[in-house]
Amino acid sequence: MAAVKTLNPKAEVARAQAALAVNISAARGLQDVLRTNLGPKGTMKMLVSGAGDIKLTKDGNVLLHEMQIQHPTASLIAKVATAQDDITGDGTTSNVLIIGELLKQADLYISEGLHPRIITEGFEAAKEKALQFLEQVKVSKEMDRETLIDVARTSLRTKVHAELADVLTEAVVDSILAIKKQDEPIDLFMVEIMEMKHKSETDTSLIRGLVLDHGARHPDMKKRVEDAYILTCNVSLEYEKTEVNSGFFYKSAEEREKLVKAERKFIEDRVKKIIELKKKVCGDSDKGFVVINQKGIDPFSLDALAKEGIIALRRAKRRNMERLTLACGGIALNSLDDLNPDCLGHAGLVYEYTLGEEKFTFIEKCNNPRSVTLLIKGPNKHTLTQIKDAIRDGLRAVKNAIDDGCVVPGAGAVEVAMAEALVKYKPSVKGRAQLGVQAFADALLIIPKVLAQNSGFDLQETLVKVQAEHSESGQLVGVDLNTGEPMVAAEAGIWDNYCVKKQLLHSCTVIATNILLVDEIMRAGMSSLKG
């Protein structure tokens, strides 16, 4: 300590016990903040930014991203928890709770003189055993719609209220089943999430097609067509400047007229090609024809297309081009040279919807769409943001379940069973590392305890009941948050993701052991030397 002080008199140093106390209090502080929003009965947090923006949430990931955390150890834990969300999409709050609890349990033994290194050895042994146990209790099953709905509901109910969660569950599962291809990874970008600020949140629905957030740019174009051909292209239908900076000089006004005509003809030829194709495929029938272009379309071209009864949308987003071809079929064209009927997609219904100043174009009734849209509705911005965060987590939960091919019982059942398995395993560990295993087992119980506490039940009483029921029946028993009584999680259809639990065990143990082994904290960066 003196050495650092000699080199840098301004350095701040915390040694041995003090360093550990600082770290443990930081972990417990963060744990106290997130403790109350675990599970379906958790409470909300209101975050007010410096500019006065308000955000209401109970999603641990959103909280940790938005909170300004000053303490270095607390921000380290927050980073680990948000990394957990990036990898698996869930488990942020559990992560913070378990790390805080591991340090709290370890602190009890360290205060009695046990060396942190011995506890960390116990933690490692316990982690290995817990992972083996997780392999035994995971339930491999056919990922049919029923199972996926249970998985999605379990995840979504922790983010939004039950009634809304049930509406979102079906939409989320059906959207994944629509975009899922055999033996290919699921690409969640193929689910577009579109917001509309009106009606109530339970009107959120799944559109088996695409919703674009702009409408046709011409007043004479039809607002609704049925049985429509869709042409997706990335071709400029407006006059563009040349790529190299060039200029034209003309001697007389006639020459200028010719030049303008030549420029117009260039674009008119492209428009004519589209119109010819429309006449070819539609004939005299009243089938619709829609052009969705990534680049611009000028007023003359819009006029010509409108006269032929073609709906044209310009400047569509690039990400929507890929979604369009997946939803409606067809091929996205970069030039109109090889324009033929095979390039066209098809949709049963295309219509424009106006909401205040905004226009939306719905492309629906597609045959077997490989890209779908979740249309979120809500009365205000807070609700929309909350639903959006929830849907993202719900989509990830369903994707994880399909990728893992297995699930584990939720409601704290796995943690209760794992703690009991670790207590039985404890005698086979040599020496004082047994205490580390005991600390790990006790720390895992924070999950069922907090679930019960947030639902308004006595946490000790509930935990004792659940443990007794588990010992008697040998089944994986969790907490029924409506009654506070034990219940078999699998029968109630409460499933968690296997990969989330696995990641939890890995990351919590690593961070808790690293924090325990810190015996000196120095704030002695270059900036503190100046002045």
From Swiss-Prot:
<dbReference type="GO" id="GO:0051082">
    <property type="term" value="F:unfolded protein binding"/>
</dbReference>
<dbReference type="GO" id="GO:0051086">
    <property type="term" value="P:chaperone mediated protein folding independent of cofactor"/>
</dbReference>
<feature type="binding site">
    <location>
        <position position="496"/>
    </location>
    <ligand>
        <name>ATP</name>
    </ligand>
</feature>
<dbReference type="InterPro" id="IPR017998">
    <property type="entry name" value="Chaperone_TCP-1"/>
</dbReference>
<dbReference type="GO" id="GO:0140662">
    <property type="term" value="F:ATP-dependent protein folding chaperone"/>
</dbReference>
<dbReference type="GO" id="GO:1904851">
    <property type="term" value="P:positive regulation of establishment of protein localization to telomere"/>
</dbReference>
<dbReference type="InterPro" id="IPR002194">
    <property type="entry name" value="Chaperonin_TCP-1_CS"/>
</dbReference>
<feature type="binding site">
    <location>
        <position position="496"/>
    </location>
    <ligand>
        <name>ADP</name>
    </ligand>
</feature>
<comment type="function">
    <text>Component of the chaperonin-containing T-complex (TRiC), a molecular chaperone complex that assists the folding of actin, tubulin and other proteins upon ATP hydrolysis. The TRiC complex mediates the folding of WRAP53/TCAB1, thereby regulating telomere maintenance.</text>
</comment>
<dbReference type="InterPro" id="IPR027409">
    <property type="entry name" value="GroEL-like_apical_dom_sf"/>
</dbReference>
<keyword id="KW-0963">Cytoplasm</keyword>
<feature type="binding site">
    <location>
        <position position="93"/>
    </location>
    <ligand>
        <name>ADP</name>
    </ligand>
</feature>
<dbReference type="InterPro" id="IPR027410">
    <property type="entry name" value="TCP-1-like_intermed_sf"/>
</dbReference>
<dbReference type="InterPro" id="IPR012722">
    <property type="entry name" value="Chap_CCT_zeta"/>
</dbReference>
<dbReference type="GO" id="GO:0005832">
    <property type="term" value="C:chaperonin-containing T-complex"/>
</dbReference>
<feature type="modified residue" description="N6-acetyllysine">
    <location>
        <position position="5"/>
    </location>
</feature>
<feature type="modified residue" description="N6-acetyllysine">
    <location>
        <position position="287"/>
    </location>
</feature>
<keyword id="KW-0479">Metal-binding</keyword>
<feature type="modified residue" description="N6-acetyllysine">
    <location>
        <position position="388"/>
    </location>
</feature>
<feature type="binding site">
    <location>
        <position position="158"/>
    </location>
    <ligand>
        <name>ADP</name>
    </ligand>
</feature>
<feature type="binding site">
    <location>
        <position position="92"/>
    </location>
    <ligand>
        <name>ADP</name>
    </ligand>
</feature>
<feature type="cross-link" description="Glycyl lysine isopeptide (Lys-Gly) (interchain with G-Cter in SUMO2)">
    <location>
        <position position="251"/>
    </location>
</feature>
<comment type="similarity">
    <text>Belongs to the TCP-1 chaperonin family.</text>
</comment>
<dbReference type="Pfam" id="PF00118">
    <property type="entry name" value="Cpn60_TCP1"/>
</dbReference>
<keyword id="KW-0007">Acetylation</keyword>
<feature type="binding site">
    <location>
        <position position="39"/>
    </location>
    <ligand>
        <name>ATP</name>
    </ligand>
</feature>
<keyword id="KW-0832">Ubl conjugation</keyword>
<dbReference type="GO" id="GO:0016887">
    <property type="term" value="F:ATP hydrolysis activity"/>
</dbReference>
<keyword id="KW-0597">Phosphoprotein</keyword>
<dbReference type="GO" id="GO:0071987">
    <property type="term" value="F:WD40-repeat domain binding"/>
</dbReference>
<keyword id="KW-0460">Magnesium</keyword>
<feature type="binding site">
    <location>
        <position position="92"/>
    </location>
    <ligand>
        <name>ATP</name>
    </ligand>
</feature>
<keyword id="KW-0143">Chaperone</keyword>
<keyword id="KW-0547">Nucleotide-binding</keyword>
<comment type="subunit">
    <text>Component of the chaperonin-containing T-complex (TRiC), a hexadecamer composed of two identical back-to-back stacked rings enclosing a protein folding chamber. Each ring is made up of eight different subunits: TCP1/CCT1, CCT2, CCT3, CCT4, CCT5, CCT6A/CCT6, CCT7, CCT8. Interacts with PACRG.</text>
</comment>
<feature type="modified residue" description="N6-acetyllysine">
    <location>
        <position position="377"/>
    </location>
</feature>
<feature type="binding site">
    <location>
        <position position="501"/>
    </location>
    <ligand>
        <name>ATP</name>
    </ligand>
</feature>
<dbReference type="GO" id="GO:0005874">
    <property type="term" value="C:microtubule"/>
</dbReference>
<feature type="modified residue" description="N-acetylalanine">
    <location>
        <position position="2"/>
    </location>
</feature>
<keyword id="KW-0378">Hydrolase</keyword>
<dbReference type="InterPro" id="IPR053374">
    <property type="entry name" value="TCP-1_chaperonin"/>
</dbReference>
<feature type="binding site">
    <location>
        <position position="94"/>
    </location>
    <ligand>
        <name>ADP</name>
    </ligand>
</feature>
